[in-house]
Amino acid sequence: MTLSFITRWRDELPETYTALSPTPLNNARLIWHNTELANTLSIPSSLFKNGAGVWGGENLLPGMSPLAQVYSGHQFGVWAGQLGDGRGILLGEQLLADGTTMDWHLKGAGLTPYSRMGDGRAVLRSTIRESLASEAMHYLGIPTTRALSIVTSDSPVYRETVESGAMLMRVAPSHLRFGHFEHFYYRREPEKVRQLADFAIRHYWSHLDDEEDKYRLWFTDVVARTASLIAQWQTVGFAHGVMNTDNMSLLGLTLDYGPFGFLDDYEPGFICNHSDHQGRYSFDNQPAVALWNLQRLAQTLSPFVAVDALNEALDSYQQVLLTHYGQRMRQKLGFMTEQKEDNALLNELFSLMARERSDYTRTFRMLSLTEQHSAASPLRDEFIDRAAFDDWFARYRVRLQQDEVTDSERQQLMQSVNPALVLRNWLAQRAIEAAEKGDMTELHRLHEALRNPFSDRDDDYVSRPPDWGKRLEVSCSS
């Protein structure tokens, strides 16, 4: 089957990019590819059998027209000016059978005009982390970019140490970022901001294109998508680590996996990025940061969208966030209905977990085994202050009995939203260290496991992290 690529971005937004081709690596070789995703995109298996090929930027497929995008942004709350694709190249937009499109974005593809002081490369460590994280999030049901392939090489890349140069093929319906809009707003080119908005609506919100107030409706949906995404992050204990405006997806996708981390111990102020000295992007601050980022996006639209309309959309953020978060947390607790005491029970559990530094994922997974008429709980042994747990658990069981469902029905619901497996940093690190020695077994094994996060397991993928695996320091270095 011949893949079809179109050039909407190149043709319709000529001032938002520089056309250029990838720069191949030395002795590049394909070490992993996503068979399930490749099948979904109707990619012939033969493309994965001819060396690095397109996956390593050594050749292009018919119809591809590679380019690096320019955008700007606020980083850690400070205007950073022009940024852009410093190491990535958008190879093309694949046209799928249903009429939708999928960007093919090659990360680590070499120098671009937007590389600033960088070398345009990515390292094996960071490409493995992003591939694992994006696929883990996908199978958790959270909107995200996807990973299609990883190529490693003999090219040295200099970071804190010398590492192997690598490339990641990332795919997404769009790489539109808040930062694209900021770039032209701060260049005082509002007509180009409007062109971006029209492009987004025409291709991704086409049902709004003929509406008189399409910009208000569109921005309201961007707010809702962002609020929903952040709510989902919070419910699974995911910390992004670098929520700069240039890393915010207009479509509400999880984008740009760098120093991310899933909670091990329940620590509301968890900071996964060791460069985040002020804790701006701490786990519990993510909802507020996302709203701040939306406010920056709204500012770029103010030359052609009424400020009252923008503020009305922004005002809807908190309610959308709380609605999505509340619904999912009730499911995680096994509540089939909404009762007035639900929030108090959840907050009391969180307080107990924070005091005891309980494992976030294991706590909710073990809670899924609760039988409403049994005072015994396997979760009890996870707590030191068992009297406090017993007090909470007794009230929790009373609450469960208000919903007229069987234990098996409730447990089935809870186990479908409380994962047994999340991508803990130590699991990724173990796969990385093996891969850096040439052994890809753990990389493939972990990828396969992450496809079934809600299935029970009896291996160390679902155990508490070892001492060396806690508080692993992760930076933006990639």
Swiss-Prot record:
Mg(2+) binds at N247, D256. Coiled coil: none annotated. It comes from the Bacteria. Nucleotidyltransferase involved in the post-translational modification of proteins. It can catalyze the addition of adenosine monophosphate (AMP) or uridine monophosphate (UMP) to a protein, resulting in modifications known as AMPylation and UMPylation. NCBIfam families: adnlytase_SelO, PRK00029.1. It catalyses: L-seryl-[protein] + ATP = 3-O-(5'-adenylyl)-L-seryl-[protein] + diphosphate; L-threonyl-[protein] + ATP = 3-O-(5'-adenylyl)-L-threonyl-[protein] + diphosphate; L-tyrosyl-[protein] + ATP = O-(5'-adenylyl)-L-tyrosyl-[protein] + diphosphate; L-histidyl-[protein] + UTP = N(tele)-(5'-uridylyl)-L-histidyl-[protein] + diphosphate. One of its GO terms (molecular function) is AMPylase activity. Belongs to the SELO family. InterPro entries: adnlytase_SelO, SelO. Its EC number is 2.7.7.-, 2.7.7.108. The active site is at D246 (proton acceptor). ATP binds at G84, G86, R87, K107, D119, G120, R170, R177, D256. The keyword Nucleotide-binding applies. The gene is ydiU. It is an enzyme of class 2 (transferase). Keywords: ATP-binding, Magnesium, Manganese, Metal-binding, Nucleotide-binding, Nucleotidyltransferase, Transferase. This is Protein nucleotidyltransferase YdiU. Its cofactor is Mg(2+); Mn(2+).
